Design a protein with these regions (language model features):
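Active-site nucleotide/adenylate-binding loops and adjacent lid/helix of ATP-dependent enzymes
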Residues: 1-6, 55, 82-88, 95-183, ...
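Short hydrophobic segments within beta-strands
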Residues: 6-8, 194
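Conserved N-proximal alpha/beta basic substrate-recognition cap immediately N-terminal to
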Residues: 9-118
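Generic beta-strand structural signal
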Residues: 123, 193-194, 252
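Protein kinase-like catalytic core scaffold
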Residues: 140, 199-200, 246, 258-262
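Phosphate-binding site of ATP-dependent enzymes
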Residues: 151-237
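A long amphipathic alpha-helix within ATP-dependent nucleotide-binding catalytic cores
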Residues: 175, 210-259, 283-294
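Glycine-rich phosphate/pyrophosphate-binding beta-alpha loops
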Residues: 265-278
Length: 295
């Protein structure tokens, strides 16, 4: 079975290398495809995909990343080519589902519409709306609409600060995305889903308000019997978004005594989860894609 790993970097990053190694361990053939040199051609009723000059002939693909800070035209081109590829062969995750999840607002909108509890969230281009949101909620987290690892997230309690930042963002054409600050008990959860099962979950413990592993949090394994509601929420959120593997971030709010889905990552990192649980996600992802390719 020939399985592709799709990235945008010229040299495979660590996560892509680990997927390639997992493919090789199963005696299958890995192919590394760079998103920026993938092309699609429609001829009559047929679709052909090219990687440079070479036609792509694979049995399945694992989508990891198509790049950051893209123009709208480049983003639409890459998404369109991946959609074309997905018509010919299984692509995991599905391109459209992946980019619904990558857009934090559309992700939460979809989840909320289907009854999944999410934090109160504002998206706006109006600095006055941002100021009013922080004034009435006391504390809010300003996040990049597309981002990961906790980078760029800022805790704001001063309405004037919210106004100033949102006005600056507006001036460079970027909307503001604010989420009410949840009073967490010093940790939140990362749950890793592949197919219809949770392969591993951890508490991310930190004395800092950010609980990302990349921001210094410590991962502690959590079993299903310890947190059944967390496991169930993660599975439901993944299913609603149409994802086949995902890292789901869930927090418990001590003020409301409820669980909330913060975001769902369609291109999740797994190093911290592997250290905490001993589970190696690339093995599960590759096994899932190979089985799907054989159907």
């Amino acid at each position: 079975v020939k399985i592709a790993v799709i990235e945008y970097r010229s040299t495979p990053p660590k996560s892509a290398l680990e997927l390639i190694e997992a493919i090789e361990r199963r005696n299958h053939t890995p192919v590394y495809l760079k998103a920026h040199i993938l092309d699609a051609v429609i001829t009559g009723g047929d679709i052909s995909i090219y990687h440079g000059r070479e036609e792509v002939n694979i049995d399945g693909a694992i989508l990891r990343n198509i790049g950051f800070f893209l123009s709208l035209e480049v983003f639409m081109k890459r998404l369109g080519v991946l959609e074309a590829l997905a018509q010919k062969t299984p692509v995991v995750n599905n391109p459209l589902a992946s980019f619904t999840a990558r857009d934090k607002w559309r992700c939460l909108l979809r989840l909320s519409t289907h009854g999944i509890p999410v934090p109160e969230t504002l998206i706006t281009e109006n600095p006055f709306s941002a100021m009013r949101f922080v004034t009435s909620r006391k504390k809010a987290v300003l996040k990049p609409i597309m981002g990961s690892l906790g980078l760029g997230s800022t805790l704001i309690s001063d309405p004037d600060t919210a106004f100033t930042i949102s006005r600056s963002l507006k001036n460079i054409g970027i909307p503001s995305y604010y989420q009410i600050y949840l009073e967490k008990p010093g940790y939140d959860y990362r749950v890793f889903v592949v197919g219809d099962q949770v392969i591993g979950a951890m508490k991310r413990v930190s004395s800092y308000w950010k609980t990302n592993i990349a921001q210094g949090a410590q991962g502690i394994a959590v079993k299903a019997e310890e947190e059944p509601e967390v496991y169930e929420l993660a599975l439901k959120a993944t299913r609603i978004l149409g994802l086949e593997y995902a890292g789901v971030d869930i927090a418990y709010d001590t003020s409301t005594q409820k669980y909330f889905v913060l975001e769902v990552n369609a291109f999740p990192h797994w190093e911290g989860l592997r250290r905490a649980t001993g589970v190696n996600p690339p093995d599960f992802i590759v096994e899932y894609v190979v089985n799907k390719a054989k159907r």
